[in-house]
């Protein structure tokens, strides 16, 4: 399957960071056949029946049944409030000193609790008047007067004092008082949320995450403020963890299927073309099966030979020999080495090689254009769309007849939500390469998503008809079937979508992502968890480097309540991530699962099962 991921990334971008593998395949975020393939993450969530909250891939997965149970039947003592956060302190007014309970004015000796309530009421008046220091004094008096067995009242006094400290931006005191309140009333949502905000200000991200996770669950995921804070801290934690991990990661060569799919998205790429006659000798392989000798002592030609034999681990070293010797094929070797640096997720190593190829005015223009495409894609992965656009435009300027420029720029335009411009680029690619099935399939998908988003039924039907024409004209294009399957799934035509995925598997039996998509379809279509997991497990069996399979398996295990297994799956995906951005997203999933595990233990919340 060639390049489904970049097409869907535009639609998924609003829901989650792209699941890219850091390789500039046919566009914006990942190599084809990698990452999340054609299915946006909100589709993954729908397929497994899980709420996908917020926009950064920070998934809190909790069953709807559990949410309803948690939201209902809980008394005021829990502190649960469905509305947005109150800005005023809590507590009803107590009888004033010298007033009897019947309002007669009879002077009665007040109990300790009554005096504490009176002090709190006075503090509330100071709070509303913006006199926070005086309010704190009153709340402190209330705490000292309140009987120690009155947990609910004491927790309110501590929470109110924390609110006053919050107005003074005394975050340490806020956290301390909220902790006291929560110790007295463990499910006190207001105190938990206020402490979460204090932890955020104190840069205690993990503590903030745990508190806000508890709030989200206890509120039944109904309060936007708490969900936004959860999303924010998960993003920060994910980026922080990924930055450290990515620096020290071991480069990892993707599967042969991944690499073949990647190169299949290029048609004007000199370095991926078969070796020409005369570039290698006519000698047979020796009895030990060693590579054929090349006529010239060229590291680049040896690298090309290894590439044809799928002996990918030796390519970078052979290219380096050509470059060090300043050989005849130095420009080609630089580009091939850069490409494999990208494939193993070493963008920092790739960039100098790409820069040098681009600057070689005497080099073949197609080499320079290809380097610009790959550097432009890399910039997009690094969230630098202006630099990316500049590189693609320069590529079009120096090599206007290069179909790859328009194909890959079309992917960029989709990521930038410029669908009409994307379609124009796909059309330009098709004019130059009428038999390039991938561009035709992706054009159909872009038109379909545009019509689907606009709820234009006639254009949706036209796009669906376009898919039929593409698969009829190009029956060997697995990507056509895969993209059509996603459109069919959107249209609730699950049976036909399943047939399309079967076609993909027939054409590319080693493409693990297709099995993941088919597995997700079983969940969405038939709620057949066993079949879905069987297919995703098959994907891992086929390609144990398929990060998308591990990520999806982890997501499902969270929904099943198997947090330990989910965390294990997310960690495996993290180790396979080929971009820092993708790794950050995966860390956010893993951190969310960790937080839910801790909250479930602390508050006695049993993880749900599907």
UniProtKB/Swiss-Prot annotation:
Q: Name one GO cellular component term.
A: mitochondrion
Q: Which residues form the signal peptide?
A: none
User: Does Oxidoreductase appear among the keywords?
Assistant: no
Q: Where is this region: Disordered?
A: 69-109
Where, subcellularly, is it found? Mitochondrion outer membrane
Q: Which residues carry this modification: N-acetylalanine?
A: 2
Q: Which residues lie on this side of the membrane: Mitochondrial intermembrane?
A: 2-41
Q: Which Gene3D superfamilies match?
A: Tetratricopeptide repeat domain
Function of the protein: Acts as a receptor of the preprotein translocase complex of the outer mitochondrial membrane (TOM complex). Recognizes and mediates the translocation of mitochondrial preproteins from the cytosol into the mitochondria in a chaperone dependent manner. Mediates TBK1 and IRF3 activation induced by MAVS in response to Sendai virus infection and promotes host antiviral responses during virus infection.
Q: Which residues cross the membrane?
A: 42-62
Underlying gene: Tomm70
Q: Which domain of life is it from?
A: Eukaryota
Key words, A-Z: Acetylation, Isopeptide bond, Membrane, Methylation, Mitochondrion, Mitochondrion outer membrane, Phosphoprotein, Repeat, TPR repeat, Transmembrane, Transmembrane helix, Ubl conjugation
Annotated positions of the Omega-N-methylarginine modification: 74
Cytoplasmic face: residue ranges? Answer: 63-610
Q: Where is this cross-link: Glycyl lysine isopeptide (Lys-Gly) (interchain with G-Cter in SUMO2)?
A: 277
Query: What is the designated name of this protein?
Result: Mitochondrial import receptor subunit TOM70
Assembly and binders: Forms part of the preprotein translocase complex of the outer mitochondrial membrane (TOM complex) which consists of at least 7 different proteins (TOMM5, TOMM6, TOMM7, TOMM20, TOMM22, TOMM40 and TOMM70). Interacts with CAPN8. Interacts with TRADD, TRAF6 and STING. Interacts with MAVS. Interacts with HSPA8 and HSP90AA1; both interactions are required for preprotein mitochondrial import. The interaction with HSP90AA1 is direct and mediates the association of TOMM70 with IRF3 and TBK1.
Query: Which GO molecular-function terms appear in the entry?
Result: mitochondrion targeting sequence binding; molecular adaptor activity
**KW Membrane (keyword) present:** yes
Q: Which residues carry this modification: N6-acetyllysine?
A: 187
Family classification: Belongs to the Tom70 family.
Membrane topology of this protein:
Single-pass membrane protein
Please name the InterPro entries in this protein's record: TPR-like_helical_dom_sf (IPR011990), TPR_rpt (IPR019734)
